[in-house]
Amino acid sequence: MITLGIETSCDETSVSILEDSNKILSNIVSSQVEIHKTFGGVVPEVASRIHVEVLNRLMDLALKEADKDFKDIDLISVTYGPGLIGALWVGITAAKALSLALKKPLVGVNHLEGHIFANFLRDDPPSFPFIALIVSGGHTEYILVEDVGKYRILGQTLDDAAGEAFDKVARILGLNYPGGPEIDRISKTGKSIFSFPKIRCDRELDISFSGIKTAVLYLVRDLKKENKEIPVADIAASFQERVVEELLERAMIALEKFNIKTLVVSGGVASNSYLQKRFKEESQKKGIKLYIPPPYLCTDNGAMIACAGYHLYQKGYKSDLSLEAKPDLLLGER
């Protein structure tokens, strides 16, 4: 079965051709990072316009690289939320047009579902049930995944997503956008010598990054007042360690609470080198089977959407031409 996956939820345009459940024939991604860097963040109207400009070309490139034609496509899969509403509509409109013209089935995919299924693009995918941690620029959630389409949110961020916190702290430290890779890079030259507050929430699997972010802000402000040098690498390393340890602690609590031995981590922040190191160390120590996609599948991409769409379709899920963009779509909502 050949699935065409389309991802346009934020600032990456991506089209992928997938054979059966996990064979990536092509996965073309056009990133807008350099464009939005000048604004210090994603500008929704600009993102939508660029999706319109590049999507058709990416489809042609994806088909060419896969050595396929439109007539070879069996299923069309597209992100329909959550995300930027204008950006989502670009992908949905293209997917519906293809479905109508080719007379092929259409499946709308939750973007977060796509991140989970990025871990299924391998020969030994995780077995249900498992705990999933999605850590990205827009989301931080702990999820009990019981089956395809069956999700239970156990905990989530009460304010900024992890990736958003990285971006904001990077800005405080004078680093470039996007902040996640910058903090990861510069932390390698620093030492975790600053103690930032532990996160406390009413629910044990919820998380909040506002306290850590504020602590960084006050630390930098006080150092400037005293005309002291800002040890950017050390602050970055200390911040990164605190965030990762908090994420890890809650993941282990969730696994123990539900007596599950499989942990799936995905989203852009999952490519952070310190996060990967600590999660691997702790998983090995506790006999947990850990899944983290390769970096190119951690960030937004069409392959994960194609994969999720394939599995949903096999379970009987499908959409029709009334499919609409849902910028605030919740995981498990249809």
Swiss-Prot record:
It is found in: Cytoplasm. InterPro entries: ATPase_NBD, Gcp-like_dom, KAE1/TsaD, Peptidase_M22_CS, TsaD. GO terms for cellular component: cytoplasm. Keywords: Acyltransferase, Cytoplasm, Iron, Metal-binding, Transferase, tRNA processing. Pfam families: TsaD (PF00814). Binds 1 Fe(2+) ion per subunit. Its EC number is 2.3.1.234. It is an enzyme of class 2 (transferase). It catalyses: L-threonylcarbamoyladenylate + adenosine(37) in tRNA = N(6)-L-threonylcarbamoyladenosine(37) in tRNA + AMP + H(+). HAMAP family: TsaD. This is tRNA N6-adenosine threonylcarbamoyltransferase. The lineage of its organism: Bacteria, Pseudomonadati, Dictyoglomota, Dictyoglomia, Dictyoglomales. The gene is tsaD.
